[in-house]
Amino acid sequence: MEERYLKMMWELKPLGIIYTCNPSHCFMDLVEELSREIPVAIINNQNEKLNVDAVELDNSKLGRMMAKHLLELGHRKVAYIAPPLTTRQKQRSKRVEGFLKEFAEAGIKDQVIIKAAREELDLDVAHIDSEYKIGYELTRELLEETKDITAIVGLNDMIAFGILDALYEAKIKVPGDISVMGCDNTLFARMHKVELTTIEHFVIFKAVSYTHLR
């Protein structure tokens, strides 16, 4: 589908193209070639292999903000659950790195457990519920491995929903027994049976920033 739309852009020759997601790795050359003829900007995370304009998040800072919030609440032993931390998805790694840096500065980096899904998952076409399943399954594994964590962080809200449901099934109270945090502030973060602590990254401001690109 993505390839079809890119070829359509060649034919339509619009004044500009806004990519609201990261281009698939197999089409990056095509996107870059297209950008030589038509202005292209990505409103997402810049890929170092792709030479086009981008409006992106500082994911390292985002990770630090998440960690700082938990530290201020008194959490010391925490877990961080993420999708595969691959070179193709560097924004994931940067978010985790920022989180770890904040705990390192507090002198307790060794108290953070990082659980990331297998890299093979990134080779398949993602299912709509794949991130939810990552949060759910890795939380179940985590609960078998350790009993003394006080907070679990999901790299994004969908993972956090999986975390919440796994804890609910294990009869662990949130936030009474374990705190849960996500990131993205999706609509469902306010609709879940337990309102999710999350971080807003103001998508509308990204769009405004794009209009200022030259």
Annotate each PLM feature.
Residues E3-K13, M28, S35-I42, Q46-R214:
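Bacterial carbohydrate/catabolite-sensing allosteric modules
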Residues L15-I17:
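Core AdoMet radical
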Residues T20-P23, P83-P84:
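Structural motif
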Residues N22-H25, L34:
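Beta-alpha junction/loop-to-helix N-cap segments that form part of ligand/metal-binding clefts
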